[in-house]
Amino acid sequence: YLAETRNFDGTAVVIFQPAEEGGGGGREMVADGMMERFGIQEVYGMHNMPGIPVGTFAIRPGAMMAAADQFDVTVTGKGGHAAKPHDCVDSVLVAAQIVVALQSIASRNVDALKEVVVSVCTVATESDSYNVIPQSVTLKGTVRTLDPKVQDFVEDRIKAVVTGIAGALGATAEIDYRRGYPVTMNAEGPTGHAAEVARQIAGDCDMGVAPMMGAEDFSFMLNERPGAYI
């Protein structure tokens, strides 16, 4: 369009997106003053999406992709021989109870109409023995939400579940909960504009696509300027 329209009234800034996968490059660029430096008034991003028909676009106003947080939990018990569990505080048992109980947050604590994912993705100990109960177990996981209030609530519940179960079973637990990418939030006006452009190109644009629980550091840019992610 810009090549064909030489009298384009405005400035188009093409943004290279470094460190998107976990590095939070978008956050660093915003903090470095990118929006002010280049006079950016609206911001748009585009991503491929396996699963939708080839040659079509999809977008929605509001929450497009989830906020992504991370947590590390260290459960500490009392190690010992597996043949004498009564002389130990079994950190593996405590960690297993925590993993199961964390799933009650989504199923029993959060409104069923509010999207939330709590996934424990790593369970590790310092031992690879068949007959030694380890002193400690480490859990690592992620939380995905589409609503800031739900995000706050889930963080509080995770901390309560982890410390409560550990204490009830005679162990201790430390939790490091870190906020990551915010919700990718499409503004109403720019979303409609992006959809219209998509229709001109492809003839169709699905504006009823469901939000996705993946995360995107383009969200940091949308927190600074109105825009849309398609």
Where are these regions (language model features)?
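Histidine/acidic-residue-rich, glycine-tolerant segments that coordinate divalent metal ions
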Residues: L2-P134, A215-E216
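Metal-dependent amide/peptide-bond hydrolase catalytic core
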Residues: L93-I230
